Amino acid sequence: MSVDTLGWSAQDWIDFHGKSTPEHSYNTLLSLLKSQKSAPEDPAWISLINEANLAHQWKVLQSKANKQQLPLYGVPIAVKDNIDSKGSPTTAACPAFEYNPSADSTVVALLKDAGAIVIGKTNLDQFATGLVGTRSPYGKTPCVFSDKHVSGGSSAGSASAVGRGIVPIALGTDTAGSGRVPAALNNLIGLKPTKGLFSCSGVVPACKSLDCVSVFAMNLSDAERCFKVMAKPDLENDEYSRPLPSNPLQKYPKNVTIAIPKEVPWYGETENPKLYAKAIENLKVAGASIVTIDFEPLLALARCLYEGAWVAERYEATKDFFATNPPESSLDPTVTSIIKTATKYDAADSFRYEYQRQGILQKVDQTLKDIDVLCVPTCPLNPTFEEVAAEPVLVNSRQGTWTNFVNLADMAALAVPAGFRPDGLPQGVTLIGKKFTDFALLELANRYFKVAFPQGSRTFGKFIDRQVTTKDDELRGPDISPEDSVKLAVVGAHLKGLPLYWQLEKVNATYLGSPKTSKNYKLYALPKTGPILKPGLRRVGEETGSQIQLEVYSVPKENFGEFISMVPEPLGIGSVELESGEWVKSFICEEFGYTQKGTVDITKYGGFKKYIDFLKQEEAKVKKPFETVLIANRGEIAVRIIKTLKKLNIRSVAVYSDPDKYSQHVIDADLGVALNGRTAAETYLDIDKIIKAAKDTNAQAIIPGYGFLSENAEFADKCVEEGIVFVGPSGEAIRKLGLKHSAREIAEKAGVPLVPGSGLVTSAKEAKEIANKLEYPVMVKSTAGGGGIGLQKVDSENEIERVFETVQHQGKAYFGDSGVFLERFVENARHVEIQMMGDGYGKAIAIGERDCSLQRRNQKIIEETPAPNLGETTRTKMRQAAESLGSLLKYKCAGTVEFIYDERRDEFYFLEVNARLQVEHPITEMVTGLDLVEWMLRIAADDAPDFESANIVVTGASIEARLYAENPAKDFRPSPGLLTDVHFPEWARVDTWVSKGTTVSAEYDPTLAKIIVHGKDRNDAIMKMNKALNETVVYGCITNIDYLRSIASSEMFKTAKVATKILDSYDYKPCAFEVTSPGAYTTVQDYPGRVGYWRIGVPPSGPMDAYSFRLANRIVGNHYKAPAIELTLNGPKILFHTETIIAISGGIAACSLNDKPIEQNKPIQVNRGDHLAIGKLSVGCRAYLAIRGGIDVPEYLGSRSTFALGNMGGYNGRVLKLGDVLFLNQPELASSSLPGPAYEPQAPPANLLPKISDDKEWTIGVTCGPHGSPDFFKPESVEEFFSEKWKVHYNSNRFGVRLIGPKPKWARKDGGEGGLHPSNAHDYVYSLGAINFTGDEPVIITSDGPSLGGFVCQAVVPEAELWKVGQVKPGDSIQFVPISYQVARQLKESQDAAIETLEDGKLQTLTSDLILPTYEDPVLVQLPKKSNLSPKVTYRQAGDRYILVEYGENQMDLNIAYRINQLINLVGKHKTVGIVEMSQGVRSVLIEYDGYKISQGALLDTLVAYESEIQFDKNWSIKSKIFKLPLAFEDSKTLECVTRYQETIRSKAPWLPNNVDFVAEVNDITHKDVENMLYSARFLVLGLGDVFLGAPCAVPLDPRHRFLGSKYNPSRTYTKNGVVGIGGMYMCIYAMDSPGGYQLVGRTIPIWDKLKLGSHSQEHPWLLTPFDQVEFYPVSEEELDRFTEDCENGKFPVQVEESVFDHKNYLKWINENIESITEFQKSQGGAKADEFARLIQVANQELESSTTNKSAVEEEYPEDAEMVYSEYSGRFWKPMVSAGDTVTKGDGLVIVEAMKTEMVVPAKKSGKVLKIVHKNGDMVDAGDLVAVIQ
């Protein structure tokens, strides 16, 4: 059915396509095209596209995933014929000038990208020279209202096409008015943008420095739509291109000032002045203020255009053409004469006229300084063809009166209709604004139309009977849409550059401006209750108020709620009145906020920033207490201290141990001093080293923090002796307070209540006697203890002597003091402490109390202030007692007086004084606003604050939770490790030293962070603490975060029923399970795995049998993304710490729960404490354990799957080990990013279970290709592949399944450039499931396999059949059968439906009727070669979800590499429907696609269509980074890889014992020549993933560096990360410890930054991308080891240079060196190549007959031996038994020490010790073998 589309707007077309089918839409466009005729029949069209071009455009458009959302979807457009549009010739209205562009101009490309369809090229004044539209040999285009009147020039044809409604949009160009005059003469909108906003790349220039592409449209909406599409910077291709400002002017004020000319020459015209006058009146009615000015400066500027050297620009654009002496019949004489006048100008004239222009512009600026807009007649006349013929130059000149100056003055213009004359002809006016006012001009035009054409009475083009609807003139403005956002004014810490600005960034806010409020406001600084000062904005009367400076932002509505949630009390969101009278959302302050004590009125400063500046100035006036201070500590306290030092502008000095070399405190400090040691004793406790560091750095003071030397009297005294201030109490005070018996004496003197106890006790016997007198229970304490060490409770006398000796030992070991005393134990005691400060001269002040009762093993867990349930009288007494004690001692600096509080009796007793800053000091700071570290520094400098006038007010409540690296499900054992993901809530205070990439050492305290919140009261603080804990994420080591969440949300904590021992009986229920036996190879996987990184060399991992995995998840009701466990051959044993539901699917094994058999493939309820055992698999190779909710492991690159070889994903990037504790997903937590269960648990019907072979015979369907017969394999070889059975090799795993079977019969003698063996190919990207012939041996590439390689693949196991590959065992037999793509999809879709529904009968399996009778030709389509730059293209089937696209012949060609890059970019630009990933090889690209979104056939059609979209010449260039990397040539680690290969895999080979010698020998060069090549070559990266994780396949750019060579055969099983190899012409850098085959020559830094720690890898973990370049520079092995360590910690500055690879220059260089290059290439061929081939052939024959291969030697133990594994990571301290000793089950075998904790590894059974594996000092990981018992 035909559709009348004439007069349709862009939106009409879009609406039509939205309701139509693609076929009907296409046919409608085709009908429109066929209805048009080109010149001479229709002079508006120079050419029209053909049907093939239209079909091609439509096919490309349909391939785009987002086509329906495109702003110009399916909208036909016309293009002026001086603008390149691929598929149509460009003539510039000169037949002799005609050429066929190879690419679209930038503007046309942008419009096509936005969905537009170009239907033809329009007529113009030749070479865009003229304003009349008559200067073209293709005919004279009339205006759409009269065949006697001109359409205007030079864009006459474009205006006609829109004016007649053929297309809604057409492109013109505008140098001097050609985008505006035709609009006026055809009743259209003519948008002439700010110069440079639209690219002119691909436009035949008229006057290049002034040219603009313009838009003709029927309505404002279409004009704006095009403007937003086309206004994109194109800096690389257009010298005059520039970006639109991010916040362009959107509208003029209501009373916009519009200037009109004082005098308007009309040249005898009488009707047009009336229309102009009417337009001016309408603008007045619309609110404009009209002023009359002298336009002479602008008119003088206009005269420059044709009087000055700008005419020479027209000549510059065409001089080469005119030099060819084109036929005069093709030239317009007027145009030619104008252009040739340029010959009279010389270079000096250019400068003279430019000086003249600049002088005029100065006058113009003065004239327009108070003007917003100019309004002029678009053109004075409506000329007839006869009038133009009579006076062609004069009429043209008059028409340009009001247009010529606009581009010279760098202004924007919009021509709009003004109505009709009595003769029915239209006219218009032009609105002209300053640059970048384009949006504002459109909005002003809209205002004008509403007055000039009320109720939508405006018509468009020739359609005087149709009206423009208000919808079609609707404007959206810039993409910052008010409809989708909230305007928010900020007044305080959210201002740019202040601490909370990040919150605006987080919610994607856009800065709009910096207005002030109206005069009705006051601004206050509220009392500081934390690190950030808060403002309070209050509305008052104008008589007392002022204007306050604001910043206004646009916040997306969907993010506004998130922003509000971060607003702290007493602030809220209300509204504020701006100086303009507009009301916007803003911060307001509750009344109690600005009335509370401590609030400061800061209105006089006019704004918050100025007040902050004032505070900084005041701070600067205060004398710094010290110039340099050394922090004698590490971890979070060192980081926290440095913050204060920075605030006070004091230089900070950090000291660090070897493990802390890259710690945060070292990074933050101004100076760092290495202490050269690992243990605390060797470093942070070494007084001499600390003192030396202070003296070497001229530190005036040392601040010790807490722990280590903070309460060491000797250290304090030593500082004084050395003339260094110790920031803390005197050594004498530390001694008195540190020895608890003397502390009690002091307390007693100070009148502080004491708990009954003893003095120092010297023996266990004496301790026993005293304990009996005190009555049990008693506390045994080390007089020097702290931090929970040297402190134990004793309940009966049979324990007292043992405990006494233990505490005595701990005191001596940790604190160097064995003194011990006893104290009565107070039942249900609370721990309440007072923060005290002393000035050292007898004055002391109690700042507040803290309740620290929540302790585990005397280690504080959660602290809070004020202490709850504490009477004010008691609180006051405690403070007084603390002050009394401090005064008595003349205490100096911070100290904490700790009390035991008996809540029942409301009594407190002295516990001890911590003569240092406490861990929990931040909560006191939060409620007081003080900086206690600053107080300490000032006191230490004898500049103590005035305690009496301090007036400290406690505001609100604060809570701190300590985050420890310890395992709460394993008795809180230390849990060191590498942190792979760390996220803390940004709104809370978090004192920490860790971040992603931090290695938590076993050497020190396990504290990772302190999470601190502040609330208006305790309930509010508890709520915030729970929120903070729920948002906290730490992965890499087990932490107590789940334990903290449990406590903080408990009723016990809410009701403050706390006591120091309450956590001993707290029933913590971890949502976790524990591995008590790991099984053979047990990992965490998810489905579909790590998708989208195959091109980088990151395998998807995921389950090997995805169907069974998904089934297990579905049985328990999990979301499909839920991680579950894959087990191989032998399953694990698991202890559940929580109730849940499980299911086991896949291979068949003996499964039991609490030793009772359970069924597979059914949901099973498990309870807390249940033991699950999965035994050896009797059928199949792998089984799957799903747990309801899924397993909580971090997401890495979009997946939680384990890639153990790459140490990523899953649980710490590895297989599960004994003792691992894995937490389950808790979707209710804010920190959880994993969906919760999606279904109820349900058992599937039996026929949905996978049919796993129990007779070791398998039939597996495969698709043929990508490589087949006759080009790679002989036909009989392919037949044999399907007729024979293949045996599964013993060396099969997740990396690949090796097969044993008939040797292939090759159809070629070698791989050509790809390699010597016929299986070799230039590196390309394999399909997952590909059967890859590595030489003559096939391997099925599986979940953890490599992506990029150089071996052919005969067939691919499709996705639906891959589950079988996951279940085959070594020794099983496989019969491969060919199936079609359609069958493969059918099987896949049935599996998906079965999993989704669990409906009986949904699963379809491979049956004989689905098998093809014979193999298929994998070549789907082949396109012939068109040119050297458009080579042959072969599309190969590569499975049911991949197509391999190969270019050209079997040779490496950089033009092909670039073509592949262009195809990848094209797919990315179009977001092509269904394409998942594009993976680049040397001469090919593997395309992965989603069969649900696009079929194989449809994708082929799209790809074929794309080929004609790719156009370039040999002079292409591409962005390229040049990386300069350090290389240690033949370092020991590189040579170790070779030696290991020789010892374990192949003892003799041509490349052994030295790879470099081999390369040198076969190339007839020296060892040194190879080394020199590596340091002089530059390598170009062609692909990634060779082998794994971004490892590059790179080629030397200098052909003389491309050596003969061969890869290892067989390949290595181990290559060290960072090793560099060369294989023939290619270079590779191994990105992980992995297999490999390149010849090894040296080692560089790691190029895979897993955690993205380095500055060079912030976007992604891989270093290189295709077309990057690599150079090496020499370093020693020692230097490289240091660089590698820096790199692994994100501190190595990689040398990288942003560059462009210029192929033109490269070819020039090749030609300059062609003789030596040719000579080298000849030397590589002939006899040398033949000899090399013979050498490799002989070596391979020797390999086949050799039986001397060695296997790695493993120590063997008797069958009844029991392996004992460590459950902990730490340092092996000492064995408790020796080999030969007899032990019983439970006896201790060895001791592992970590984080101040000694952990015993017990015997699992009774027997004789065969071996203790480690020696003292060894580092032991959890799961490592430590002992063997028989």
Curated annotation (Swiss-Prot):
Keyword Lyase attributed: no
An example molecular function term from Gene Ontology annotations: ATP binding
Entries under Gene3D superfamilies matching the protein: 1.20.58.1700, 2.40.50.100, 3.30.1360.40, Amidase signature (AS) domain, ATP-grasp fold, B domain, Cyclophilin-like, Gamma-glutamyl cyclotransferase-like
GO annotation, biological process: urea catabolic process
Positions of modified residues (N6-biotinyllysine): K1796
Binding site residues for ATP: G115, A116, I117, V118, I119, G120, K121, T122, K740, E823, N858
Cofactor entry: biotin
Catalytic activities: urea + hydrogencarbonate + ATP = urea-1-carboxylate + ADP + phosphate + H(+); urea-1-carboxylate + H2O + 3 H(+) = 2 NH4(+) + 2 CO2
Source organism, top-level taxon: Eukaryota
Keyword hit for Signal: no
Residue ranges of every copy of the Biotinyl-binding domain listed in the record: 1752-1830
Pathway(s) this gene product operates in, as recorded in its UniProt entry: Nitrogen metabolism; urea degradation; CO(2) and NH(3) from urea (allophanate route): step 1/2; Nitrogen metabolism; urea degradation; CO(2) and NH(3) from urea (allophanate route): step 2/2
Domain Biotin carboxylation: 625-1068
Pfam families xrefs: AH_C, Amidase, Biotin_carb_C, Biotin_carb_N, Biotin_lipoyl, CPSase_L_D2, CT_A_B, CT_C_D
Keywords: ATP-binding, Biotin, Hydrolase, Ligase, Multifunctional enzyme, Nucleotide-binding
Domain ATP-grasp: 744-941
Entry EC number(s): 6.3.4.6, 3.5.1.54
Family membership noted in the UniProt record: Belongs to the DUR1,2 family.
Function statement: Involved in uracil catabolism. Hydrolysis of urea to ammonia and CO(2).
Subunit details: Monomer.
UniProt protein name: Urea amidolyase
Organism per entry: Lachancea kluyveri (Yeast)
Phylogenetic lineage: Eukaryota, Fungi, Dikarya, Ascomycota, Saccharomycotina
UniProt gene name: DUR1,2
